[in-house]
Regions:
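Substrate-recognition element of Asp-dependent hydrolases with the DxDx(T/V) motif
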Residues: 32, 36-69, 83-94, 133
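Active-site neighborhood of HAD-like aspartate-dependent phosphohydrolases
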Residues: 1-45
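Active-site flanking residues adjacent to catalytic metal/cofactor-binding acidic residues
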Residues: 7-9, 50, 124-125
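Gly/Ser/Thr-rich beta-alpha loop segments that engage phosphate groups in nucleotides
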Residues: 13, 56, 60, 126
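A short acidic, helix-capping loop that chelates divalent metal ions and anchors anionic groups
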Residues: 17, 21-22, 54-59, 92-97, ...
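Asp-based, Mg2+/Mn2+-dependent phosphohydrolase catalytic module
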Residues: 3, 63, 67-84, 93-122, ...
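A short alpha-helix capping/helix-coil boundary motif
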Residues: 13-16, 51-53, 84-85, 107-110
């Protein structure tokens, strides 16, 4: 079985100072691509699992989200890094099993890529990210303010990667 790191997007890979509704709103943190490259080199699959309820609420369309993700992937690839797949939940009010804190997106990717969730990590900046990781059976790393349920709490993705690779 394979090991993976599941990343939330906003607040982990890119700045979330304002909503990312268009490609020009996406501002990657300077350490993101290098952090992902370290994970790639260590043999981890790297996935993004992101709640994008703005689609259901009408702030942007799935086409816009695809353009944002194309830009994100191009910027990551410039550094030689790779995101294996991006999974998103477009729901906000609709009941579903994909919107975090549900583990649906993580479990879907784990099944598709034969991932051992017990040897994998979920990294997020919100409590719902950590709860999704726990429900999926991953180790969890919270970025920013401490959350007692998380296995680790760090300042940014680069620090999280150092924990994973130690």
């Amino acid at each position: 079985m394979n090991k993976a790191v599941f990343l939330d997007r906003d607040g982990v890979i890119n700045d979330n100072y304002k909503p990312v509704n268009r490609p020009q709103d996406l501002k990657l943190y300077p350490w993101s691509a290098q952090s992902i490259l370290h994970l790639n080199t260590a043999g981890y699959y790297v996935f993004i699992v992101t709640n994008q309820g703005g689609i259901e609420m009408g702030y942007f369309k799935e086409k816009d989200l695809n353009e944002i993700h194309i830009k994100l992937l191009k910027e990551i690839e410039k550094a030689g890094a790779n995101i294996d797949e991006i999974e998103f939940c477009p729901h906000f009010r609709t009941k579903c099993n994909c919107r975090k804190p549900s583990p649906g997106m993580i479990k879907k990717l784990a099944e598709k890529y034969n991932i051992n969730l017990q040897s994998s990590f979920m990294i997020g900046d919100r409590d719902v990210d950590i709860e999704a990781g726990i429900k999926a059976g991953c180790k969890t790393i919270k970025i920013g303010k401490s959350y007692k349920k998380a296995d680790y709490t760090v300042e940014n993705l680069l620090e999280a990667v150092k924990i994973i690779l130690q």
